[in-house]
Amino acid sequence: MAKKFGYTYRGFTTIVSDFRKRLKQYSAQDPFFQPRPKGRSKSVSAGEAREVVISLRKKYYSVEDIKVTLDSKGLPVSEKTIYTILKQEGFSRLPRRLKAAKTRLEPPQIQAAKSGMIALENEEFKSASAGIITLLPYIEHYGIRKSMEQSGYPETKTISKLNSILSFIALKASDISRYTTDDLWCMDRGAGLFAALNVLPKAAWFTSYSHRVTSKMNRDFLTRLHKIWKEEGLLGDTANLDFTTVPYWGEGDHLENNWSGKRGKALSSLLAVLAHDPDSGIIDYANANVKHSNESAVVLEFLDFYKDGNKKADTLKYLVFDSKFTNYENLNTLNKEGIKFLTIRRRGKNLVGRLNNVAANKWKTIRIEASGNKKRTLKALDEKVNLPGYEGEVRQVSITGNGKIKPAIIISNDTDLPVERIVRKYARRWLVEKAISEQIEFFHLNKVSSSMVIKVDFDLTMSIVTHNLYRLFARDMDRYAHRSDQRIYQEFIKNAADIKIQEEAIIIQLKKKRNLPLIIEKMQPFKDLEYPWLGNKKIHFEGATYS
């Protein structure tokens, strides 16, 4: 018989032996014709979730709210399954409720795990903020990870300096406005994976960590990043400098009053300086410890930072800033250092009156490129003038728009650059004002919870690092490089995903989104990149089958 049906003798006797055992074990059943069960087999997750679903429904949770809670408990059950369970248990549909009634729900008591290094075992989980993981390739590719490891920032017994910095960046990149509301992130596994942790630390840890940071640590870290930007060609020959006011809304008698353009008045605040590259959008330098007594010398401090002891570092050729940034004596110092400057001269009453009396034939009509591939017609007066405290003559370019606006007066020590390029170069300085405004809004620098300058300086440093990661990401997204950080977050970064940790790779299955195909395409060049802080695993980005 075994030979007839192609079995070996030993294999056939094993089949007979197993059949006899089943006859003894299931004597009441037909051994040949067994009924086939109808419908889908019940999943293990649905069985485990039944009690949770019933418990939450008794607290008037909707199907959507129950789904969110089950996901946080690691029970991947669909909304349809939840509805089926409720129907089987005899629950009717919830009555129509006002928004206020929905927000009065008793929150489920979920014990958040203690933050620690991720185990990186084979597992699957969901995350509501997994989109930030698309920034990790840029951290590794550009060598930013090494700068974090070599920085002087503190670490703890369980969380290294790399994991600590990545934890702050994870919150910044996720548009978290207040660190005190840790229930927004302390159970999200995807945000924890970004920092190679099981989950991000609680709010108390972030507060405690920032108390241990010094200004020297921030300066050292920015210096390391500065070298990366220079080596990668992300810093051109021009730097736009500007002050920004970081308001503090508590009691801060030790703080100075600084003018806030957005509020239209002076506020008790901290004054910070930023240096912005107009071409790449990279913010290269920041310092939140600027006082009224030394604000004029900030331009020289930035010059020292840029050269970092290397006087032959001649990449930087132009500094662009407004009229209140420094004084004429420091302009003279820049000129001696061989640095070209572009700035606005303050329009005194006598100066404006003299320009109004200049003959019309001395004004030159110029065409300046504007946004939207358009051009603007202006009139310019190019002349040489003397300034108090400045040795020699300086170039002065006065521009007006056919009498419709007051004259703007640009002064520079560059005598070779055409007038059109002088005006265009200064006009691009407004990009730094736009970048600062966006950064304050998106990274919530206008909501600082401490009046300690060092803590704000650290917060500003982390904001800059995250901003630069957004710029690197945006540069890769075709036709989206000009988007603000807020729009990049909304259109690309803000996304949930199913995450699978495997032996050699971590699979990120991002939910359907309009720009998802572009993200997956631009992540392909990084598919073979290994991440040392994630066990040298690779990260592969895919699209999920649902939105």
Language model features: what each stretch is:
Residues 109-130, 144-547:
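Anion-binding and metal-coordination hotspots
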Residues 12, 52-53, 66, 82, ...:
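Mobile genetic element proteins and their domesticated derivatives, centered on retroelements
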Residues 19-26, 86-99, 108, 204-224:
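Short, basic alpha-helical nucleic acid-contact segments in DNA-binding proteins
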Residues 48-60, 165-173:
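Short, amphipathic alpha-helical "recognition" segments used to contact nucleic acids or chromatin
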Residues 3-14, 71-84, 157, 188-205:
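Short, basic interhelical loop/turn and adjoining N-cap
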Residues 1-4, 58-72, 79, 174-188:
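Short, charged amphipathic recognition helices of the HTH superfamily
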Residues 63-101:
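Conserved short alpha-helical interface segments
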